[in-house]
A protein has these predicted regions:
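Compositionally biased, low-complexity flexible segments
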Residues: 5-7
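A short, polar/charged loop-to-alpha-helix boundary motif
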Residues: 86-97
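A short, conserved beta-strand element enriched in hydrophobic/aromatic residues
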Residues: 77-83
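Zinc-dependent deaminase
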Residues: 1, 10-12, 20, 24-59, ...
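Short helix-loop-beta connector
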Residues: 105-109
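Short beta-strand scaffold segments in enzyme catalytic cores
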Residues: 65-72
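Short, flexible loop/turn motifs enriched in small residues
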Residues: 59-65
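Local cysteine-cluster metal-coordination motifs and their immediate loop/turn environment
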Residues: 89, 113-130
């Protein structure tokens, strides 16, 4: 029953690539959508590299072990992991620094991170989310939303609101959890 008959109205906004059909059933508007799993082999490959890079991080009680891969539109890649060159650097920051040191223009690039990019920091002036927005990345792909252990992360939400395409592949999250078993 619709709201006019004492029923509830449920609103679902399908993704742009979903195939949907609309019909009326017993006086109700019904939308049926076919959703396809998001399994780009390219995304999974780069994300697996990021997860592997996260395993190179020295475990710390004050931070997650994260890996990141910057992929430029021309196909060049730059990989980093948490604490690679400094005890305060995050993986995204390390990979971005390497790309900038190589003279790369990051506008339109993608970044693959084993964990959701941080949205606030106490050890650096800019969060990874701010760095991603500042440098004009068009896509962010990660495996695991950042747990609320240290801060309440809003990275994915902030990036989406700014128009950045955000993809999450939880099928690779197990490797991220393993790399961060020291925080369990």
């Amino acid at each position: 029953l619709g709201p006019e008959r004492g029923g509830a109205r449920f609103v679902f906004t399908p993704p742009p690539d979903a195939e949907c059909r609309h019909e009326e059933v017993d006086g109700m508007e019904v939308t049926t959508c076919t959703l396809r799993p998001d399994t780009s082999a390219e995304d999974l490959g780069y994300l697996a590299q990021a997860v592997a890079a996260g395993r190179l991080c020295t475990p710390s009680a004050t931070s997650y072990c994260v890996g990141a891969v910057v992929v430029l539109p021309d196909g060049r890649t730059f990989t980093g992991h948490t604490h690679e060159t400094s005890p305060t650097h995050h993986a995204e920051q390390e990979a971005i620094r390497k790309a900038l040191d190589a003279g790369a223009d990051l506008r339109g690039a993608a970044i693959y991170s084993s964990m959701e990019p941080c949205s606030q920091r106490s050890s650096e002036p800019e969060s990874c989310t701010q760095l991603i927005l500042h440098h004009g990345f068009s896509r962010v792909v990660f495996a695991l939303y950042e747990p609320d252990r240290f801060v309440r992360c809003r990275g994915a939400r902030t990036l989406r609101e700014a128009g950045v395409e955000v993809r999450v592949y939880p099928s690779l999250a197990g490797g991220v959890r393993e790399a961060n078993a020291h925080l369990q």
